[in-house]
């Protein structure tokens, strides 16, 4: 589970937490002493912990929009955000109920209502996409505040619409969906953490070791995000994490080569010893 914080054109991974199913926690506790047993923490509890940590760091009076996909869209989490005077924009599953009616039924109920055509810039180099949306206002089940739901289709004949909730009723559907697009960097972070930085390489390790590994990987991606921020130039795309990683590797290699040349010049009769000290494990051709 990840919490990403966008700041203007920049974005930083604020925190990551490992979610373990209740069954997995019971399994792990069989091999642990009573005083070291793990407590099960639900998705809501993990999200709440991260949001409360972030809240303490936010400037007073900040306008906050919390964005998440349908996996996290519980009434408890939505209500937590509303109690903090934050707004929520999130995806919803089709079986959620608005005014006691499933939201997927509203597509038929509103068939007399014309679609609103909106255009959203793509989050990648592809052309802008057009969507056809309808909105319906009411109360989501177990959420006391009035909200509105966006029914979004790729075309008027699309039979698999997507559903989104917005608690800020002053926003248009286009404004709400444009804000929701800012959630995309979370997916980029997730992919990069697992495939490049090795976040998923924690199998068969103790829970304590996993937490330490998460902290190390979190620091690594924050370094790359900070590097991207330093390299930012207005009216130019923000450097990708891959570009920042390559630049770091090149800088590290250059520093190593300079040190290698310097040491060999000082001690020309100890070439192999110097190579082994600076490049351990690499065989030297003779």
Which residue stretches match the model-derived regions?
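Short acidic, glycine/tyrosine-flanked loop/strand segments centered on an H-E-D-like triad
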Residues: 20-28
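An internal, acidic/charged active-site-proximal segment
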Residues: 28-151, 236-244, 284-286
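Short amphipathic alpha-helical "interface-anchor" segments enriched in bulky aromatics
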Residues: 121, 173-204
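Short, conserved catalytic/metal-binding motifs centered on acidic residues
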Residues: 3, 65-73, 88, 164, ...
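A conserved active-site cap/scaffold subdomain adjacent to cofactor or substrate pockets
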Residues: 159-166, 179
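Acidic, metal-ligating active-site segments
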Residues: 1-21, 114, 144-152
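Basic, amphipathic alpha-helical segments enriched in Lys/Arg and hydrophobic/aromatic residues
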Residues: 202-257
């Amino acid at each position: 589970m990840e919490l990403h914080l966008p700041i203007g054109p920049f974005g930083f991974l604020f925190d990551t937490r490992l979610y373990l199913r209740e069954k997995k926690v019971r399994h792990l506790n069989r091999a642990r002493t009573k005083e070291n047993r793990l407590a099960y923490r639900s998705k809501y509890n993990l999200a709440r912990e991260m949001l409360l940590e972030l809240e303490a760091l936010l400037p007073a009076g900040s306008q906050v929009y919390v964005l998440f996909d349908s996996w996290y869209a519980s009434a408890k989490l939505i209500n937590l955000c509303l109690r903090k005077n934050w707004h929520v924009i999130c995806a919803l599953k089709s079986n959620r109920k608005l005014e006691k009616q499933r939201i997927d039924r509203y597509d038929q109920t509103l068939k007399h209502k014309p679609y609103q055509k909106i255009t959203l810039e793509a989050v990648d180099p592809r052309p802008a996409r057009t969507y056809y949306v309808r909105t319906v206002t009411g109360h989501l089940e177990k959420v006391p505040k009035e909200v509105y739901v966006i029914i979004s289709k790729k075309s008027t004949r699309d039979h698999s619409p997507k559903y989104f909730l917005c608690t800020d009723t002053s926003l248009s559907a286009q404004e709400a969906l444009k804000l929701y697009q800012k959630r995309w960097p979370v997916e980029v972070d997730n992919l990069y953490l697992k495939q490049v930085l090795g976040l998923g390489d924690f199998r068969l390790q103790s829970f304590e070791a996993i937490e330490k590994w998460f902290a190390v990987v979190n620091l690594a991606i924050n370094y790359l995000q900070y590097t991207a921020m330093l390299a930012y130039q207005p009216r130019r795309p923000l450097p990708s994490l891959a570009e920042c990683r390559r630049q770091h590797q090149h800088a590290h290699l250059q520093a190593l080569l300079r040190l290698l040349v310097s040491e060999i010049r000082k001690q020309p009769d100890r070439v192999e010893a110097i190579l082994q000290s600076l490049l351990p494990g690499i065989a030297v051709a003779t």
